[in-house]
Amino acid sequence: MAFFNIFRGPKPGGPEAVRARLEGAMAKRRLRGWNPPLENINALVASGGPRLLARSRELVVTNGYAANACEAFAANLVGDGIKPSSLITDAALRDRVQKLWLAWTDEADADGLTDFYGLQAMVAREMFVAGECFVRLRPRRAEDGLLVPLQLQLLQSEMLPFEKTETDPNGNRIRCGIEFDLIGRRVAYHFRRRHPGDSTDQRVAVPDTVRVPAEDVLHIYRPIDAGQIRGLPHIAPAMVRLFLLDQYDDAELDRKKTAAMFAGFITKTAPEDPMMGEGEADSDGAAIASLEP
């Protein structure tokens, strides 16, 4: 009979066990003000994503703790760069492929600022700051003079508008800048033509966004909820505490600076006495006075 006991339901634990399990749902005095909305992660990202992203970028630039955390995250994620190793058994072909790969890594950046391994570090930093990064595959022409006619262009999270949520004329849904077909597959990304915060890029009037097929885009992010379509800054859970800690540090430094100042009152017994009890002035007109606490 003991064998069948494992298929039976658990024995009731009594009122105390039920109370312990549902304590988080209580609305008594301690938890009366805790009423978070039950929203989908995508709705939260669409409404608060731009402000969260702006605050995250400011913290990483102005807060030393956040800046160090960003660099540590990138160093632990990619280090000096993830280097692939060929599994081709033909030694001659493997050497040719390896030389071609090494040549391409120096030309991989579409902006011409760094190499393939530097791009990995930039992606890692964007993952920490913005929670996501977009890599656009840019095929090149033969006259561009590249050994491999392909380059990678990094696009920040701001380049894909959070507010672009609409229905395309073809029936596809665009959510936070990402176009989905009728069965929920990603078919395109609607990128801005220029960064919304870059006042130095004053181009002629062009459409606000450009449609890029999904097969030409790598969307790198870590979803934390099922169905999540955009990334969240990795610093988001500690953002408020870091901001308040920064204010506390400034206030504490000001308090210490004020406390370290030496203050006193200057008194004299007669109007004709020297203000500080100094002696006679020297030939340069300067006099020396002593001051004690």
Residue spans for each PLM region:
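Extended, charged amphipathic alpha-helical segments
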Residues: 217-293
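Intrinsically disordered, low-complexity linkers and terminal tails enriched in Pro/Gly
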Residues: 7-30, 200-203, 274-291
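N-terminal-proximal low-complexity accessory segments that begin disordered
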Residues: 1-86
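Extended interaction regions within the primary functional domain
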Residues: 46-49, 53-54, 90, 115-121, ...
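Generic structural signal of hydrophobic/aromatic residues within well-ordered alpha-helices
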Residues: 41, 48, 56, 69-70, ...
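Structured, mid-chain assembly/scaffold modules that mediate subunit interfaces
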Residues: 62-223
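Generic, ordered loop/turn and secondary-structure boundary motif
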Residues: 8, 179-181, 249, 267
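Alpha-helix capping and helix-coil boundary motifs
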Residues: 14, 112-115, 165, 233, ...
